[in-house]
Amino acid sequence: MRFVSLAVGAALLGAAGASSISSNVGLLKANGVALGNWEAAYEKASAFVSGLTTDQKLALITGSNVESTNGNFTPLYFLDGDMGLQDFYYVSAFSLSSALAMTWDRDAIYEQAKAVGSEFYNKGVQVVAGPTSQPLGRTPWGGRGVEGFGPDPYLNGLATGLTTKGYVDAGVIPGGKHFLLYEQETNRTSSFGSSGEGSPYSSNADDKTIHETYLWPFYDAVKNGAGAVMCAMTKVNGTMACENSDLLMKMLKTELGFPGMVWPDMNGQNSAKGSALGGEDYGSSSIWSTSTMESFLSNGTLSEARLNDMAIRNLIGYYYVNLDNGRQPTRQTTDVYVDVRANHSKLIRENGAKSMALLKNEGVLPLSKPRVMSIFGAHAGPIMGGPNSNVDVMGSGPTYQGHLATGSGSGMASMPYLITPYGALTNKAAQDGTVLRWVLNDTYSSGGGSSLVPSSTSSTAVEPSFENFATGSDICLVFINALAGEGADRTELYNADQDAMVNTVADNCNNTVAVVNTVGPRLLDQWIEHDNVTAVLYGSLLGQESGNSIVDLLYGDVNPSGRLVHTIAKNESDYNVGLCYTAQCNFTEGVYLDYRYFDAHNITPRYPFGHGLSYTTFHYSSLAIKAPSSITKAPKGNLTVGGPSDLWDVVGTVSARIANNGTLSGAEVPQLYLGFPDSADQPVRQLRGFDRVELSAGQEAVVTFNLRRRDISYWNVKTQQWMVAGGKYTVFVGGSSRDLRLNGTFFLWVGS
């Protein structure tokens, strides 16, 4: 949800039972976590809090100004989001996180985060409500999957960590969200009647699933400097996430060593006692009123140590990113002219092009000065009300009647402008002398006898229809999208109107290219095998430069290198997880999401996770594996910020030679997948490495993947540790989860 400051003014749900904790679990300096480079920030925060009265500490943790003998503190200002500042003028609209993940480019992910963070910093905003690791994408029907980095924990985790680091390096506090298991919009706040007692749904998952899938990316966030974490508005295993001490005090603050503050999503704080004891550190002054909290202190419900810990956690991120140095510009009202965009439009255009995946190409792309080109679909052009028209998915249809380049709710950017494909293609046609025709509608059939369309056969005018414009065109571009976002899940994974448009155009045009921008998996089987559908570009939402990014790819100014971050199935029924419509949402699929499920059940996808083509070709060879012959079963390192210190140690490497054996320069994304010994009870194979390597025609390079201890570990529910299984590991390197060109094995002997 949107945040404008540390002041929760939303209506809060009735009280519910809270988890209880032992006295010192999760408290800084009492939980056994070595703070490392957070130590100086802790000392500053602790010194400030030591001079506060109880009332001042309560003011601090409820977002009020604090004036003390130690100095003054103004409440932090929180704002969405990962795609750029909301509600401000003169800011950039970046690609959404799901698009950025499709670049599979560590540098691109980091540089965008640093650019976003710099705009927050220069606008006087202290906290980014992001990165958005979750929703992870448990179900393709989930409305907010577009805001995250995809359903693979490894890829999601690396992107989450790099984004966190980018924000920190820009001088702002990253606020990772949503913690935890928040995977759909349906019934996130709704009443279920007497059985649900007006509560949101409960996501119920076992310990192994939580650790190996949903908690995994938060390790990366914490390791890379997250100073805040937003607890979700829903329940986890029957307890509100913001009151769940197992999640917050045990897993997040102790196991992961998180030193920062936990603050609630809207409606996330349910009761004063439950949230205070459960692990929330910032709350509403109407719930944590002075009288209520002082009564908790006096009767022993809340300890002074816990209150001090809450106060310190509210400050530690501020000191960690050096916001106390006084250099940050003062925040102005949203419409005051403070232009913070720098040259970010160039970065947005480049990342947008890097992110789109070429799924199919039968030699039609790249384009070269076509004589007659027709474009079709509402997604090609602008919406009538402009790019900042409110994208409200609640009550809207499954598609957007204009070019979709940003999300909704917390995923919506403040557009300074929007380059549509129609606009960019018009400029290109003018340069090339191309005749350009268009129907910017998904269901248009004829001109209706308009007097503006002459009927004379000697005229060059053509009565506008899909059939008429497609006939005689050298190239036909059909633009389609899929809409969903905060507040509403998806109702379909394909669209009858758009699919009929593609088929109609393809029936009349032997070079039909489909351009798809979607909020999640979008089925293509209604037309993908049509003989005249000769190419498909597929991506997420690209931000203000969207049209330029797409045209750069269509004409070959950029060679496609994007890769899928989800599996595209042939049928909706191929996916194993749908939406949950009951109060209890049981994650019975465990760790088997997306390609892990498809592999386990030998389901053939239309396009696999990691797939993407290029205008050139690449050859893989020379697999080399360097792994230890033995390793301890469990990590032995100290508990640090980010978990046991040696969980992050590199314990082996895998390398392969990649050669560009085509005729054009391009970038390849080699991917490493790992198969575990049977005793680890893991999926068939899991992503455990990737790289993006740019190669000129004829050039080759050796790519090396580092295997960390955590990459070869599984969660042992009995010992409550990350453990390494002894036995045979199988290594696969290739271009997708199904395009596995090299393979090898290594054996590990595991000692105590």
Curated annotation (Swiss-Prot):
Substrates-to-products reaction catalysed: Hydrolysis of terminal, non-reducing beta-D-glucosyl residues with release of beta-D-glucose
UniProt keyword list: Carbohydrate metabolism, Cellulose degradation, Glycoprotein, Glycosidase, Hydrolase, Polysaccharide degradation, Secreted, Signal
Pathway terms, separated by semicolons: Glycan metabolism; cellulose degradation
MF terms (GO), sorted A to Z: beta-glucosidase activity
Main enzyme class: hydrolase
Record: active site: D265
Single GO cellular component term: extracellular region
Signal peptide region: 1-18
Glycosylation, residue list: N187, N237, N299, N343, N441, N510, N532, N571, N586, N638, N661, N743
Keyword flag Glycoprotein: yes
Domain of life (superkingdom): Eukaryota
GO biological processes: cellulose catabolic process
Location, primary (coarse class): secreted
Role, per record: Beta-glucosidases are one of a number of cellulolytic enzymes involved in the degradation of cellulosic biomass. Catalyzes the last step releasing glucose from the inhibitory cellobiose.
Recorded family membership: Belongs to the glycosyl hydrolase 3 family.
Protein name: Probable beta-glucosidase D
Source organism of the structure: Aspergillus flavus (strain ATCC 200026 / FGSC A1120 / IAM 13836 / NRRL 3357 / JCM 12722 / SRRC 167)
Lineage per the UniProt record: Eukaryota, Fungi, Dikarya, Ascomycota, Pezizomycotina
